[in-house]
């Protein structure tokens, strides 16, 4: 697994591989670099709905099992200038999520298990602009509904036990943006680690540092790039009643992410595309690749609609003894997102 980081924070951000933190187009810039909201001169509201699905194919000791999970994920953002120097933003989105099913493994994992820690962040930010540089402070409340489903079967009789609950915690971030020239800008954000939980679950989220750059090649074409470092070693989610034998919920190493994207405007249309590479945090490692396409259409000078497609190609996980493959796991994901933003 790449980890619990979820980078598909809005339709616009997904289509640009979340590499666009140095260049603000709408309020969803709050999910990347809140300091960049100083580039938005008017009050701005943005909303998206992503339909996200992952298929997982297991081959364990020659026994094949396939799983398919699908989840709708809503997000919303609001930004408003307070005066010429101060700006306020409010974000509601998910930057940390998982929905994983692990099949029965003889002698090792007798119960088929599904774990779904889905975390929703509510994050207000205040930004201050001084000439071409801006700074922002963000507070993050993380609401975490979770579930643990375990199924035990004997012959053709199966029994499923489900444990559900909610927990929450706090985190924060500092960010800065610099408009170097009219065509070049950069941004930097550091998200602090967080730790919280209850008697059933312990959540330890990593600190994340991200650097963004944007370069306007022409007045209508912009290139975006980003690098992120997540300190995932030893961080993740632990269930009191689940041992995680494959190691999908806890990081064994830190993770680096690189992404780049491009946006070109033609009349009322915006054409977007991007690619991102993430280091997997599990024991076997590998690179998870994601490819994106997106389009935007300016319906009026105030209202724009966006659409995005994401295709995920995860690194194959294999445990081999001699010439025999003991365990093989292959994940593939697809997402479709539709959203819009309105400038007041």
State the predicted function of each range.
Residues 2-14, 60-61, 70-344:
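Outer-membrane beta-barrel porins/channels
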Residues 5-18, 38-55:
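Transmembrane beta-strand segments of Gram-negative outer membrane beta-barrel proteins
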Residues 20-25, 30-43, 78-84:
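Outer-membrane beta-barrel pore proteins
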Residues 18-25, 53-70:
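Surface-exposed strand-loop-strand hairpins of Gram-negative outer-membrane beta-barrel proteins
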């Amino acid at each position: 697994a790449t980890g619990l980081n979820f980078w598909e924070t809005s339709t616009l951000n997904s289509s640009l591989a979340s590499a666009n933190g140095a260049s603000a187009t709408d309020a969803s810039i709050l999910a990347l670099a809140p300091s960049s909201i100083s580039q938005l001169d008017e009050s701005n509201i943005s909303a998206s709905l992503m339909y996200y699905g992952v298929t997982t194919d297991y081959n364990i000791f020659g026994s094949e099992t396939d799983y398919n999970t699908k989840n709708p994920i809503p997000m919303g953002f609001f930004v408003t200038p307070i005066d010429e120097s101060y700006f306020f933003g409010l974000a509601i989105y998910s930057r940390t999520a998982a929905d994983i099913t692990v099949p029965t493994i003889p002698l090792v994992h007798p119960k088929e298990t599904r774990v779904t820690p889905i975390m929703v962040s509510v994050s207000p930010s205040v930004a201050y602009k001084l000439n071409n540089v801006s700074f922002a402070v963000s507070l993050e409340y993380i609401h975490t509904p979770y579930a643990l489903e375990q199924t035990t079967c004997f012959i053709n009789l199966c029994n499923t036990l489900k444990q559900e609950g909610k927990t929450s915690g706090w985190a924060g971030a500092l960010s800065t943006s610099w408009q170097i020239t009219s065509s070049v800008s950069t941004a930097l954000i550091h998200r602090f680690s967080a730790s919280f939980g209850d008697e059933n679950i312990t959540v330890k989220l990593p600190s994340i540092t991200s650097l963004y750059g944007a370069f306007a090649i022409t007045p209508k074409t912009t290139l975006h790039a980003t690098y992120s470092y997540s300190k995932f070693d030893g961080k993740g989610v632990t269930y009191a009643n689940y041992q995680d034998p494959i190691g999908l919920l806890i990081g064994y190493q830190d993770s680096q992410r690189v992404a780049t994207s491009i946006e070109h405007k033609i009349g009322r249309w915006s054409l977007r595309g991007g690619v991102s590479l993430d280091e997997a945090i599990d024991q076997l490692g590998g690179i998870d690749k994601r490819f994106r396409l997106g389009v935007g259409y300016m319906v009026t000078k105030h209202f724009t609609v966006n659409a995005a497609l994401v295709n995920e190609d995860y690194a194959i996980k294999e445990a081999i003894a001699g010439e025999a493959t003991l365990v093989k796991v292959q994940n593939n994901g697809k997402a479709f997102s539709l959203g819009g933003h309105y400038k007041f």
